[in-house]
């Protein structure tokens, strides 16, 4: 277990964990051709160099070098509706619990639009062996609430990106069987900000102020630490963290019209460093010192099939399983070994199923369509910072060949998330004398429009 000078970092990374386009903070947008079929058949289809990101064994199907670059723009529309209340528990008061303040927890469009880039290259070495390299984003999220948001202790700003750099090789074992193996270096950035919100109003209450005067530091000066709603109470920023993993794949081609593929991507541990933390944990509300936390990006397995039914029509499908239960809890301790943080996450393993079809209209134009169902990972414990939900994908796409070597992929997907109701609770203070309990009740609604564009070139 890593040791900490402050418990902030564990708090921050708990909060930095979805959006309308992925379970928890996993992203599916590795290519535009895949977007057009709702990423059905990803481990079995080899229509461009993006196979580097899905199943490296598919590189054995290429006869010439392939290059692909582009990205997907994710236009999320996630709205939060609800209320937030702050209560003070004053042990020395005969009134016991008193409601101090109430406010709105509603906010619109809390996840801003984001561009998810990709870049791939595949080079056959001979009839049996091929090499590939790629850059894509498998995990990431961003959510933003106003600085003066009443439920700022739950909202604020969260920004996590993890750029995956991959080197892969593929080997054709027999005419039908191919194997692939790759190594991954993940470059990650994280920024988390939380604000006082309604807590700043609570500590201005005269009874609370009186109770604060007999507290130990730093609670004694809590009203001075939190002068306004936009006061930062949680802060983390790390712009350069690395993690490493591997991936493997197998592909079996029964004939040119039928193949199946299985791909596995290992977990990746990202070591974040917090150098100047701020925390509102009990008795810790000041700048912290250096601390570390390892966040695990989960491993996942995908099984896919591709079947060319006629000269023009093909169908494809996928089942993807992500091992989110690796993130059951976050633990941290101070340098002296005392517990700083122990939080249950209750993430659940999730499944994604997809079905798609491709139609070769003529030699230049290929059309695609797909549908998918993606299960939420945070089904038992949700967060305003991560408005995760079950979602359904509806996708359309096309590839147009300008020349035998140059083509462009276009893709669109509409994602509709289920309405979700949940509650978040935060307590600060000393339970022996004074605590401030903040509770927010939320209803979240999410949908998103995804637009993709990729250019492909065959040498």
Swiss-Prot record:
Its main location: membrane. InterPro entries: OMPP1/FadL/TodX. SUPFAM superfamilies: Porins (SSF56935). Residues 1-22 form the signal peptide. The keyword Chloroplast does not apply. Keywords: Cell outer membrane, Membrane, Signal, Transmembrane, Transmembrane beta strand. One of its GO terms (cellular component) is cell outer membrane. It comes from the Bacteria. It holds the Pfam family Toluene_X. It is a multi-pass membrane protein. It is found in: Cell outer membrane. GO terms for molecular function: long-chain fatty acid transporting porin activity. Belongs to the OmpP1/FadL family. This is Outer membrane protein P1. It comes from Haemophilus influenzae (strain ATCC 51907 / DSM 11121 / KW20 / Rd). The gene is ompP1.
């Amino acid at each position: 277990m890593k040791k900490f000078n402050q418990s902030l970092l564990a708090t921050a990374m708990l909060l930095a964990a979805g959006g309308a386009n992925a379970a928890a903070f996993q992203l599916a947008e590795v290519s535009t051709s895949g977007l057009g079929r709702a990423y059905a058949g990803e481990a079995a289809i080899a229509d461009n160099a993006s196979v580097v990101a899905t199943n490296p064994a598919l590189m054995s199907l290429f006869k010439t070098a392939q290059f692909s670059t582009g990205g997907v723009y994710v236009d999320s529309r996630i709205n939060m509706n609800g209320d937030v209340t702050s209560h003070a528990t004053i042990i020395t008061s005969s009134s016991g619990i008193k409601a101090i303040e109430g406010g709105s927890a509603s906010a619109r469009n809390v996840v801003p639009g984001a561009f998810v880039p990709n870049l791939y290259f595949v080079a056959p070495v001979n009839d049996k062996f091929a090499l590939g390299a790629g850059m894509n984003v498998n995990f990431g999220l961003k959510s933003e609430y106003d600085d003066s948001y009443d439920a700022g202790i739950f909202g604020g700003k969260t920004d996590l990106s993890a750029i995956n750099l991959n080197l892969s090789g593929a080997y054709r074992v027999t005419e039908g069987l191919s194997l692939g193996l790759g190594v991954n270096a993940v470059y990650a950035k994280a920024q988390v900000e939380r604000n006082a919100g309604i807590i700043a109003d609570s500590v201005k209450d005269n009874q609370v102020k009186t109770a604060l005067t007999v507290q130990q530091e730093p609670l004694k000066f809590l009203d001075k630490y939190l002068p306004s709603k936009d006061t930062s109470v949680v802060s983390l920023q790390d712009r350069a963290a690395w993690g490493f993993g591997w991936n493997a794949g197998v592909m079996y081609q029964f004939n040119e019209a039928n193949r199946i593929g299985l791909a596995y991507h290992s977990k990746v541990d990202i070591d974040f460093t917090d150098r100047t933390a701020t925390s509102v944990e009990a008795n810790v509300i000041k700048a912290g010192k250096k601390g570390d936390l390892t966040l695990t990006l989960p491993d996942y397995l995908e099984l896919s099939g591709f079947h060319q039914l006629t000269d023009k029509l093909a169908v494809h499908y996928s089942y993807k399983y992500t091992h989110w239960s690796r993130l059951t809890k976050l633990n941290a301790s101070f340098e002296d070994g005392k517990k700083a943080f122990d939080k249950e996450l209750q993430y659940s393993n999730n499944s994604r199923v997809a079905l798609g079809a491709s139609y070769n209209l003529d030699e230049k134009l290929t059309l695609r369509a797909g549908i998918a169902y993606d299960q939420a990972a945070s089904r038992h414990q949700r967060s305003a910072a991560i408005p995760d939900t079950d979602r359904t994908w509806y996708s359309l796409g096309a590839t147009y060949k300008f020349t035998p070597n140059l083509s462009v992929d276009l893709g669109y997907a509409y994602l509709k998330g289920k309405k979700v109701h949940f509650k978040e609770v935060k307590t600060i203070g000393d339970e022996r004398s004074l605590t401030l309990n903040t509770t927010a009740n939320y209803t979240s609604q999410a949908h998103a429009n995804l637009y993709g564009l990729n250019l492909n070139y065959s040498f």
